């Protein structure tokens, strides 16, 4: 029922056709299925989340060479913007355990997402910069989510989840 509003009638189209003028590519399939021309065909400031593991749908370096305005994330730790469940699961469970929740509901997951998003915009502490051999990480194209080794995650995400669990 909820998916019907996103359905389109007509002929089947290729991934290449679907990406033309697209704002976002969200890949969760297999590596190597997106090429530089497909990224070039996207709308201005495209978002490419190539999350297939171990190899993304398009390699980070290829996407960045395709166009300078791309906002890119992968599931890999060797590139900026690693999208990985390690940012959520430990702290969602910590928050749930802290209040003895017997289930993890949508509100708790949404609270975790909002906490992670808020933390991403905060000034990055020196300990995180040092852990990643960086000088000054900050919110932007190469830092859209916190780094997995950010020690603040537990203090932001777990309490938000716990609060959502008891409300």
Question: What does each model-identified segment do?
Answer:
Residues 1-30:
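Glycine-rich phosphate/diphosphate-binding loop of Rossmann-like nucleotide-binding domains
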Residues 5-8, 25, 49, 89-93:
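Aromatic-residue hotspot detector
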Residues 50-158, 162-165:
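Adenosine-phosphate binding glycine-rich loop
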Residues 14-16, 38-39, 61-62:
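Short, flexible, glycine/charge-rich loop motifs used to bind or transfer phosphoryl groups or to couple energy/partner
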């Amino acid at each position: 029922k909820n998916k019907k509003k996103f359905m389109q009638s007509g002929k089947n189209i290729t991934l290449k056709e679907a990406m033309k003028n697209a704002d976002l590519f969200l890949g969760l399939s297999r590596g190597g299925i997106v090429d530089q021309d497909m990224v070039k065909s996207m709308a201005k400031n495209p978002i490419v989340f190539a999350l297939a593991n171990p190899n993304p749908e398009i390699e980070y370096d290829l996407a960045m060479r395709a166009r300078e305005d791309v906002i890119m994330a992968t599931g890999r730790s060797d590139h900026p913007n690693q999208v990985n469940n390690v940012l959520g699961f430990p702290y969602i469970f910590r928050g749930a355990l802290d209040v003895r929740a017997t289930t993890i509901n949508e509100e708790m997951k949404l609270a975790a997402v909002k906490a992670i998003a808020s933390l991403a915009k905060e000034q990055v502490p020196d300990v995180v910069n040092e852990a990643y051999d960086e000088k000054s990480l900050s919110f932007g194209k190469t830092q859209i989510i916190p780094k997995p080794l950010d020690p603040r995650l537990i203090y932001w995400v777990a309490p938000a989840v716990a609060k959502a669990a008891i409300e």
